[in-house]
Amino acid sequence: MTPIQASSDQLVSIDALRRRIGAPDCPVPIDARTAEDFAADPRFIPGSVRRPGLDVRAWASEFTGKSTVVYCQRGLKISQGAAAYLRLAGAQAVALEGGFESWREAGLALVPEAAIGSRDDQGRTHWVTRARPKVDRIACPWLIRRFIDRDAVFLFVQASEVLAVAERFGATPFDTEGAVWNHAGENCTFDAMLEAWGLDADPAIARLARVVRGADTGRPDIAAEAAGLVALSRGLSALIDDDLRQLEQGMVIYDALYAWACNAEALSAANLGAAA
């Protein structure tokens, strides 16, 4: 995991973290706010894990050898103290300059905890969908692991058993008939998740969503890249008959598509600036 660039006082700017969110080598954002601060605004920076900042000595070893960005409410004593203890434990740790408040005031994406499924005793969410995934059932797990819960658990079962498995095992069903997370009108499940989690305002994600929507709903005309994604998805499914292995390989496809979307948005912004 590539360390994030920090200033000499072990702080990192919100813009530096924003540019890394969603990338496979993004540092782990650690939400170290107090329970009171979290209750006042129960949303989190995309990709965050929650840990009690003042109890850092009990959990610091989880992040040994990992790159992390710690944030508390204002980026002061709790996050900076927790980051210092993490460095003692062998983590690459910096504190987020200005903390949660600066991120929120900048109007950047925040994910509502209430919109996420229940978590197990390790803080992981569990999801279940139909076996033999193609587009949406790879795109959605990619979105969840990169922006919601990097340790999320995914189950692939017979279509007829998805809802029953969800009920029995406390998992959240998606992209299946009768699930909350499913197609709505012309939109696919990926679109539904983006909107509910407040991620659809990101231009790069919106660009990627058009490709996923076009590929998943049989409308390649809405994005030139959609036909290519269909071909890759079907080819991957034909090549790999293990759904979990297919998911792991599919993550690389969506990492590449998101990197393409980010670069395309940066180029568009630069061209607009030059034209002005």
Regions found by a protein language model. Name each.
Residues 99-111, 116:
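Long, charge-dense
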